[in-house]
């Protein structure tokens, strides 16, 4: 009996060991399959800023490479991406500081069976909601690494213009002045034109918290690191972050990473749009995205044509912006892009000019209002929504136009009014503006903690003119 039990036990033990062996072999096969087939490499011959020139390496544009460097006697790698060619040279743009590289250092290209090279896969998933990530999808919030089922490559998805659904619905932004006077449609692309210190970040935070949208994607491109944290913790808040995805590429990272962050934020918005969600995309700022494109283009030897910007930059902005909007059979992406202007007197710098021409409207922030403590500091006279007449009632449109007329009349004659030189009865429109000016000012101002729905905004506008 004991011999039989011992024999059975040995048999079971052998089966378990054999099963373990099979599992180990299977695991080893997976690891072998994931190994690179080859590591091709070239030699570094020149470094100019973040631009690297390499010989002996053939790779398509967009390929991810690894450059050796020596720091404290240790050989480490930095990441770089192929951005161009020049005769027998391959041009790479470094994603990190080039400290520690040396002439003749090896530059590796990792190749696989089914792909020529690694171009960088970025995670896409509903798990991204509530997270703060960098341009590669790596966590910046100290939480666990993402492990989504879906990935994307950073490429531009061209939308057939005949597949774009018309803008017919009003988007409730929760901001009274915008809802009533610069009404935005679902799927519209709007520029927020502002110089520094005018409350741009506060306005964006209010939009992110109060806008009626299923998902909010926020791209912080080229901002100061301190401002990124301040925006997330103090302006957006935990409630706003819960339905948002924040992609941050601060000013101290490589221009190429800033470009990829803008594209990644747009890719996430496209992902949720395909899931039939109404997406709000906020990008701060489109100007810094253009500056990053300029840095890469100038490194490649392109000639500047307007205020230091090469011509290729002006084609990159429409490619990014045109990915948003409405599409048939899917949801929508309503996008707000901040555009930094040098001054209100001369806003027609090349980036501001191209943005005005391709966007569906613009909201201008005024330094005059900001200095008076008037927030949000929206310059109603110079702001416009191109789709507004098509999505609101005729009554609201006429009231909004008359409101703007009163504001413009008062502002043009402000100095005369302040010194008492204006004679009452000279201009009936100005008389009306002077009479209700405190009401107009109160309507345009809104506390950061205050939310004003579209219906209540229209009702308050209507009450002014009863």
Swiss-Prot record:
Q: Which UniProt keywords apply?
A: ATP synthesis, ATP-binding, Bacterial flagellum biogenesis, Bacterial flagellum protein export, Cytoplasm, Hydrogen ion transport, Ion transport, Nucleotide-binding, Protein transport, Translocase, Transport
> Coiled coil where?
none
GO biological process terms held by the UniProt record: bacterial-type flagellum organization; protein secretion by the type III secretion system
Family annotation (InterPro entries): AAA+_ATPase, ATPase_a/bsu_AS, ATPase_alpha/beta_chains, ATPase_F1/V1/A1_a/bsu_nucl-bd, ATPase_T3SS_FliI/YscN, P-loop_NTPase, T3SS_ATPase_C
**Single GO cellular component annotation?**
type III protein secretion system complex
Q: Where in the cell is it found?
A: Cytoplasm
Q: Where are the transmembrane segments?
A: none
**EC number in record:** 7.1.2.2
What does it catalyze? Answer: ATP + H2O + 4 H(+)(in) = ADP + phosphate + 5 H(+)(out)
First-level EC class: translocase
The family database entries (PROSITE patterns) matched by this protein are listed as:
ATPASE_ALPHA_BETA (PS00152)
Q: Where does ATP bind?
A: 194-201
Return one GO MF term.
proton-transporting ATP synthase activity, rotational mechanism
Superkingdom, according to UniProt? Bacteria
Q: What PANTHER family has UniProt attached to this entry?
A: ATP SYNTHASE (PTHR15184), FLAGELLUM-SPECIFIC ATP SYNTHASE (PTHR15184:SF81)
Q: What does this protein do?
A: Probable catalytic subunit of a protein translocase for flagellum-specific export, or a proton translocase involved in local circuits at the flagellum. May be involved in a specialized protein export pathway that proceeds without signal peptide cleavage.
Which family is it part of? Belongs to the ATPase alpha/beta chains family.
Descriptive protein name: Flagellum-specific ATP synthase
């Amino acid at each position: 009996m004991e011999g039989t039990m011992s024999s059975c036990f040995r048999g079971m033990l052998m089966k378990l060991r054999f099963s373990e062996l099979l599992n180990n072999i299977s695991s080893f096969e997976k690891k072998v399959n994931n190994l690179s087939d080859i590591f091709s490499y070239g030699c570094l011959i020149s470094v100019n800023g973040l631009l690297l020139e390499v010989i002996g390496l053939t790779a398509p544009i967009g390929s991810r490479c690894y450059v050796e460097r020596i720091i404290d006697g240790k050989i480490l790698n930095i990441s770089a991406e192929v951005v161009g060619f020049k005769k027998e040279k391959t041009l790479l743009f470094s994603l990190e500081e080039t400290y520690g590289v040396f002439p003749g250092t090896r530059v590796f290209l990792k190749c696989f069976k089914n792909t020529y090279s690694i171009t960088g896969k970025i995670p896409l998933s509903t798990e991204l909601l509530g997270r703060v990530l960098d341009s590669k999808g790596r966590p910046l919030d100290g939480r666990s690494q993402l492990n989504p089922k879906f990935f994307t490559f950073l490429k531009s998805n061209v939308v057939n213009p005949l597949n774009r659904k018309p803008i017919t619905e009003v988007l409730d932004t929760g901001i009274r002045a915008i809802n009533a006077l610069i009404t935005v449609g679902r799927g519209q692309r709007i520029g927020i034109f502002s110089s520094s210190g005018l409350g741009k970040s506060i306005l964006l935070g209010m939009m992110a918290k109060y806008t009626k949208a299923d998902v909010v994607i926020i791209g912080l491109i080229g901002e100061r690191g301190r401002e990124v944290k301040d925006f997330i913790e103090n302006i957006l808040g935990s409630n706003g972050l819960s339905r948002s995805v924040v992609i941050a590429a601060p000013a101290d990272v490589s221009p190429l990473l800033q470009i990829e962050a803008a594209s990644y934020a747009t890719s996430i918005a496209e992902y949720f749009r395909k899931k039939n969600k109404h997406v709000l995309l906020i990008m701060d700022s489109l100007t810094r995205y253009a500056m990053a494109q300029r840095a890469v283009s100038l490194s490649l030897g392109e000639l500047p044509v307007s205020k230091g910007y090469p011509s290729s930059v002006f084609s990159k902005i429409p490619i990014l912006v045109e990915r948003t909007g409405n599409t048939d059979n899917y949801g929508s992406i309503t996008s707000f892009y901040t555009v930094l202007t040098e001054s209100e007197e001369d806003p027609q710098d090349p980036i501001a000019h191209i943005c005005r021409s391709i966007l569906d409207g613009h909201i201008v922030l005024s330094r005059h209002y900001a200095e008076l403590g008037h927030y949000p500091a929206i310059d109603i006279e110079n702001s416009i929504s191109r789709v507004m007449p098509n999505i609101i009632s005729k009554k609201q449109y006429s009231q909004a136009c008359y409101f703007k007329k009163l504001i413009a009349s008062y502002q043009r004659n402000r100095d005369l009014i302040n010194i008492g030189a204006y004679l009452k009865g000279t201009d009936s429109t100005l008389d009306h503006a002077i009479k209700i000016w405190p009401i107009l000012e109160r309507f345009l101002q809104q506390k950061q903690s205050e939310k004003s729905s579209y219906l209540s905004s229209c009702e308050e506008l209507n009450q002014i003119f009863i």
